[in-house]
A protein has these predicted regions:
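Hydrophobic cores of alpha-helical transmembrane segments in multi-pass inner/ER membrane proteins
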Residues: 22-23, 60-74, 129-146
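Alpha-helical transmembrane segments and their helix-start/interface "positive-inside/aromatic belt" motifs
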Residues: 9-23, 90-97
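Non-cytosolic membrane-interface motifs at loop->transmembrane helix junctions
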Residues: 47-54, 89-91, 116-131
């Protein structure tokens, strides 16, 4: 089933640019979290605001680095329309767009839970925001072949 909303851009380069912007935002989040964990500059929120604690940071950081490497390969693949990551089938693109909807919906539910919680039970907002960035990246990636 075709997703109800997809991103319609004029060229592979346009999709790659959107994906690259989202990639840079995620990279800034990873760098910000590293700085918060290691040097704690006063101009950044403290580490506790960057980190939900769902995965120990010693595993989270390498996972984020792997994501960044794969995301770079995806951007380059889409821009060049080259295999393996830039030449998806339309079926794969539809699945990825639907997955981005589910991902964003999960983060919307998490955001609502955050907003309704008492301040001492709220958790952290920064990871939620950047999960939306990742959902947007998937949305653009899947849309690039539709």
């Amino acid at each position: 089933m075709a997703p109800p909303i997809v991103l319609h851009l004029s060229s592979a380069r346009a999709y790659a640019v959107v994906m690259a912007v989202l990639l840079v935002l995620f990279l800034l989040r990873v760098v910000g979290q590293i700085l918060a964990a290691t040097t704690a500059p006063s101009w950044l929120p403290p580490m506790a605001r960057w980190y939900s604690g769902l995965m120990p940071y010693r595993y989270l950081l390498p996972t984020q680095i792997v994501f960044l490497v794969v995301m770079i390969a995806m951007v380059v693949g889409v821009d060049r329309r080259s295999s393996p990551l830039g030449t998806l089938s339309a079926t794969a693109g539809r699945w990825i767009v639907w997955a981005s909807y589910v991902y964003a919906l999960g983060m919307a539910a998490r955001s609502i839970r955050y907003a309704l919680a008492t301040p001492e039970r709220r958790g952290v907002l920064i990871p939620i925001i950047f999960h939306f960035v990742l959902a947007g990246f998937l949305f653009a990636y899947g849309s690039s072949v539709l």
